[in-house]
């Protein structure tokens, strides 16, 4: 829920718990994106952190965000983040660079997953994974949601299941 709220979703934790636990129905637009994110986290909890599964997680979490043909696919357009006033705050990797940057990202991720790391190193690299992913901004939308999921996924793979509760 908090990952969804960062993206501007209006749903609150109490409402989402009532929706998931007790089946209380809300207007579909109120819960769809958060439901998708919940499903992506559920998928991640039972899947290995790798390229194929990250792309699948994006397909799941972006079901109600981007068109089906863009889900889990690398973007081919320029990407930037702007303020509500329209001022550009950040320009992501150029479309011609995204594929290569993601190949490096997945290669480095694979190496980190194989390394014995201290707890401090795990937290450091989890934060770096998040940062590098959002700097590349590989998807048309859902980059922040994906980065937060990948960060938590990495923590859980390295520290165990309880890391999902952080």
Task: Tell what function each PLM region has.
Residues 1-166:
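FIC/Doc superfamily catalytic core
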């Amino acid at each position: 829920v908090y990952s969804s709220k960062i993206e501007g979703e209006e749903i609150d934790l109490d409402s989402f718990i009532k929706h998931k636990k007790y089946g209380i129905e809300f207007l579909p637009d109120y819960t769809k994106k958060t439901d998708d994110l919940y499903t992506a986290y559920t998928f991640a909890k039972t899947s290995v952190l790798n390229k194929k599964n990250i792309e699948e997680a994006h397909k799941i979490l972006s079901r109600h965000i981007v068109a089906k043909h863009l889900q889990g696919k690398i973007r081919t357009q320029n990407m930037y983040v702007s303020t509500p006033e329209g001022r550009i705050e950040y320009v992501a990797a150029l479309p011609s660079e995204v594929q290569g940057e993601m190949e490096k990202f997945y290669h480095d991720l694979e190496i980190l997953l194989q390394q014995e790391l201290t707890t401090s190193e795990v937290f450091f690299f989890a934060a770096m994974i998040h940062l590098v992913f959002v700097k590349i901004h590989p998807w048309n939308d859902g980059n922040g949601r994906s980065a937060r999921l990948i960060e938590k996924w990495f923590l859980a793979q390295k520290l165990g299941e309880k890391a999902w509760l952080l």
